[in-house]
Regions:
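Surface loop/turn motifs at the tips and blade-to-blade linkers of beta-strand repeat domains
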Residues: 37-42, 77-81, 125-130, 173-184, ...
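Conserved blade-ending motifs and adjacent loop-strand segments that build the rim/top face
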Residues: 219-238
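Short coil/turn segments that connect the beta-strands within blades of beta-propeller domains
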Residues: 53-54, 92-93, 141-143, 195-196, ...
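Short loop/turn segments that connect beta-strands within beta-propeller blades
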Residues: 68-72, 115-119, 164-168, 212-217, ...
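Beta-rich catalytic cores
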Residues: 44-45, 83-84, 107, 131-134, ...
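Beta-strand-rich domains and repeat architectures in extracellular enzymes and scaffolds
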Residues: 35-62, 84-87
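Blade-loop segments of beta-propeller domains
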Residues: 72-109, 124
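Structural motif
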Residues: 65, 104-112, 154-161, 206-211, ...
Length: 261
């Protein structure tokens, strides 16, 4: 009887776990939506997008294209070596980009900076051999916040780390299962600070996840999953509208979006 009881409990746990994993991958209802408000063709729109009030920037593995917001015309392309550029964000009139040697091993990451006046890429901070690949970086509360990711069965090890201006680690957090369960074998590709927390994106899904810093512990607190017009990848804030810019990778487009509740 004890063996039968044990087997029944095991079967119930197995079925329940499988059902929960299935629900995680379903499209979740949301009380909000990031709605597309515009788009712009950009050959470099394969990794991420960023914006100023006058221009938008399409980011590919190796270069950044600058486009006039009003005309949609390409006005410049970056110079300087790059292997795998990821998300970018503007700070003090310069574009800061996560960069790594992905998919090569061992992992190596750095932050590159681009001045729109000369469109030259150069290294700001070289992490050397890193624990995971750097996919996005932002500034918040006077510190650097950097996302290092793992893929496949190891993607649960992906973490957000907070550095001071001397690149001393202050804290790090992993992601909640509500987010990890929707990434498949991929990981966190983009992120930014907004609305009292972080909006982050996956690699492919047309949705964004909002998380915030926990009051205690080392796991970020899940807030919500919201539909979005971006096909995953890097996102950035749009200073002109207060919305976001991202990409449609397949269509090679920069996509503009605003939050509707």
């Amino acid at each position: 009887m004890a063996i039968v009881k044990f087997l029944l409990i095991w079967i119930i746990l197995f079925v329940t776990t499988a059902a929960l994993e299935s629900v995680e991958r379903e499209k979740l209802p949301a009380a909000a939506s990031w709605t597309k408000t515009g788009e712009l063709l950009a050959a470099e729109a394969t990794q991420a997008a960023a914006a100023t009030k006058s221009h938008v920037y399409a980011i590919s593995n190796r270069e950044v294209g600058q486009y006039d917001r009003k005309t949609g015309r390409k006005t410049a392309v970056s110079t300087g070596e790059a292997h795998h550029l990821n998300s970018g964000f503007f700070w003090n009139q310069k574009l800061y980009l996560a960069h790594s040697n992905f998919p090569n091993k061992p992992d190596s990451s750095d932050i590159r900076v681009l001045d729109p006046r000369d469109m030259r890429l150069h290294v700001l901070k070289d992490f050397g051999k890193s624990e995971g690949s750097l996919t996005w970086v932002v500034r918040h509360k006077g510190d650097w916040w950097c996302m290092f990711v793992y893929y496949g069965d190891q993607n649960h090890k992906s973490y957000l780390v907070r550095f001071d201006d001397h690149w001393q680690e202050k804290s790090r957090w992993t992601f909640p299962q509500e987010v990890l369960g929707r990434l498949g074998k991929m990981s966190i590709s983009g992120g930014l600070w907004k609305d009292g927390g972080f909006w982050v994106s996956g690699h492919d899904e047309r949705e964004l996840y909002r998380v915030r810093l926990p009051k205690a512990g080392s796991v970020l607190e899940y807030v919500e999953t919201v539909p979005a017009p971006f096909t995953g990848q890097g996102i950035a804030e749009d200073p002109l509208t207060g919305g976001l810019v991202g990409i449609d990778r397949k269509e090679r487009k920069i996509v503009f979006s605003e939050l509707e509740r």
